[in-house]
């Protein structure tokens, strides 16, 4: 899945968010013994309850204190484990997405642990990755839908703002109901507001460092050595390297790629455009939004009408003319490209775009080929531009937990989900709730991926095979950057070894991409946050959006391949976009963006 922040005050909001998450995380892991772990829960609870009773003895009965604590009272579960069980145990129906590596949520070990801890029983309804949206929409439309929805995001503009099936949470977001959540996101609640200014869902974070620099290009260094050339750093040098490669390997592919959306950042245009202007797209989409950015004056613009975009197309056409770009780059799937990459004797591939090399080459079955590829930093273009897209809004997402009007006790539902925002909520749901068996905190003498003292060590790793001990990727991820980078890692791990992928991607992102982000380079354009439109706004531009994207994508291929002459066809291309309603599309985006800023 992809993750988006919903507010535009980039510098201040992002700084505040990172500070809040870092402070929350640091405080949480300093506790050391408060949250989950089946062997220690009762001991921790009894000790803390006794302390609470002693402190409150002068004014109230200890049972009253315990009751207050179990409804929140502003004290987080990390601070006081007597927050659970909840005061009003409930049974809720819930819809979420199933995953093939989790056998049965109803009988899952973590499900049982969470039910015993909180006193809340969940009756699950699920849909697969392929059909959850259709299944959930049918339920919401029929009137037969669950109390809560989590781990998937329905159309909040339609089912929340317009129809009221999903209820606003503003009145329920209190220290009594969700103290852990507010500890982490209290200053960022605006990021989850919909077009009417109300909050219909909870935020979550999965701050994957290398995912924010996902427009990576992998180049085969063995071929560079054979050609006697260095890693190219400019568009001119890249052109020369491609030409020399094709002279030596006439059947080779100098610059591979896939149809947009087939892989994870696997179309070469995303990476190569940064030599001319910012590519402002987002993951997993192929619509006009991919070519929409905001300038320093706060104006929404379409980069596909910029003269620098025309220069980009001209450069791509020059690569196409020498065979560096081939027709398959625009049509093939990720699996087809994977087949090409893994058959170098038939079709040697010099460069291939992808967020991670592991999507193409398996380090275990093909270690030699795996080690031949290294990341290629963005190239410096003719005017000195050298950019990579920093997906700054990919770390935090709204739409992670919602309550419907069927739910008779929203407060208790929020108290239940608040566990996921506690210091060990992510560890327990991802890897299991047995501290000392599934994970340990603050492992002595070990360091994290960032070189700092490790915050935790995973003992029961992620499994792609069916299991029923934990939820793995199901549900709500609460993983700030410091938390992800704080996982214990062997400092001497071979980045190209079976256990070195995270190290490889982290180093590549930090060294070859982060220095060239739009923020670091003070670029004139920036990426947009997710546009939180009303249902009417979305409907009004839906046809325009499809038509504009079609013109941009089809014309891009035509100009690059020479099927359409760039100089003689450029004005006609711009005219086609105007006739398709590009100005109306940008006006709608502008209105939504301005509204979001004012909230």
Model regions and ranges:
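Ligand-binding "clamshell"
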Residues: 158-170, 198, 361-388
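Helix-loop-helix "hinge/cap" segment bordering the ligand-binding cleft or interdomain interface
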Residues: 170-173, 196-271, 292-344, 401-438, ...
């Amino acid at each position: 899945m992809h993750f988006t922040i919903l507010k535009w005050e980039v510098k201040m909001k992002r700084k505040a968010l990172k500070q809040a998450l870092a402070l929350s995380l640091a405080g949480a892991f300093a506790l050391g013994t408060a949250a989950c772990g089946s062997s220690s829960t009762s001991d921790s609870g009894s000790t803390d309850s006794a302390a609470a009773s002693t402190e409150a003895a002068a004014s109230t009965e200890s049972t009253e204190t315990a009751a207050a604590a179990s409804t929140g009272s502003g004290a987080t579960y990390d601070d006081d484990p007597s927050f659970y069980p909840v005061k009003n145990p409930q049974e809720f129906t819930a819809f979420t997405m199933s995953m093939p590596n989790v056998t049965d949520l109803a009988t899952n070990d973590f499900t049982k642990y969470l039910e015993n801890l909180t006193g809340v029983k969940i009756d699950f309804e699920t849909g697969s990755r392929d059909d959850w949206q259709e299944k959930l929409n049918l339920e919401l439309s029929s009137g037969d839908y669950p109390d809560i929805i989590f781990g998937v995001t329905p159309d909040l503009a339609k089912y929340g703002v317009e129809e009221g099936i999903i209820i606003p949470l503003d009145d329920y977001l209190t220290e009594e109901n969700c103290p852990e959540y507010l500890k982490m996101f209290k200053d960022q609640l605006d990021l989850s507001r919909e077009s009417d200014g109300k909050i219909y869902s909870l935020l979550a974070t999965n701050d994957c460092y290398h995912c924010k620099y996902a427009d990576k290009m992998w180049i085969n260094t063995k071929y560079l050595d054979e050609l006697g050339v260095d890693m190219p750093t400019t568009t001119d040098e890249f052109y020369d390297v491609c030409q020399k490669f094709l002279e030596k390997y006439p059947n080779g592919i100098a610059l591979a790629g896939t149809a947009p959306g087939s892989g994870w950042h696997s179309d070469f245009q995303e990476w190569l455009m940064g030599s001319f202007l910012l590519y402002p797209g987002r993951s997993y989409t192929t619509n006009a939004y991919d070519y929409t950015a905001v300038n320093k004056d706060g104006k929404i613009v379409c980069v596909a009408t910029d003269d620098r975009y025309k220069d980009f197309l001209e450069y791509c056409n020059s690569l196409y003319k020498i065979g560096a770009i081939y027709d398959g780059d625009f049509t093939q799937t990720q699996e087809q490209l994977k087949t090409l990459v893994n058959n170098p004797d038939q079709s040697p591939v010099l460069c291939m775009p992808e967020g991670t090399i592991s999507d193409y080459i398996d380090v275990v079955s093909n270690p030699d080929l795996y080690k031949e590829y290294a990341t290629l930093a963005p190239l410096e273009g003719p005017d000195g531009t050298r950019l990579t897209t920093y997906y700054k809004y990919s770390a935090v997402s709204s739409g992670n937990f919602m309550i419907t009007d069927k739910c008779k006790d929203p407060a208790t539902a929020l108290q239940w989900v608040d566990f996921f925002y506690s210091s060990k909520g992510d560890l327990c749901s991802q890897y299991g709730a047995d501290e000392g068996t599934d994970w340990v905190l603050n492992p002595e003498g070990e360091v994290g991926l960032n070189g700092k003292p490790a915050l935790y060590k995973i003992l029961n790793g992620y499994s792609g095979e069916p299991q029923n001990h934990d939820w793995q990727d199901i549900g709500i991820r609460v993983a700030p950057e410091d938390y992800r980078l704080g996982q214990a890692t062997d400092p001497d791990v071979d980045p190209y070894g079976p256990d070195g992928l995270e190290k490889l991607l982290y180093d590549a992102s930090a060294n070859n991409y982060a220095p060239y982000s739009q923020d670091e380079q003070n670029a004139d354009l920036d990426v947009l946050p997710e546009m939180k439109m009303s249902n009417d706004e979305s409907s009004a531009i839906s046809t325009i959006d499809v038509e504009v994207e079609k013109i941009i994508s089809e014309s891009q291929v035509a100009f690059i391949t020479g099927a359409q002459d760039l100089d003689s066809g450029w004005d006609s291309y711009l005219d086609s976009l105007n006739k398709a309603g590009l100005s109306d599309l940008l006006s709608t985006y502008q209105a939504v963006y301005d509204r979001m800023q004012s909230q």
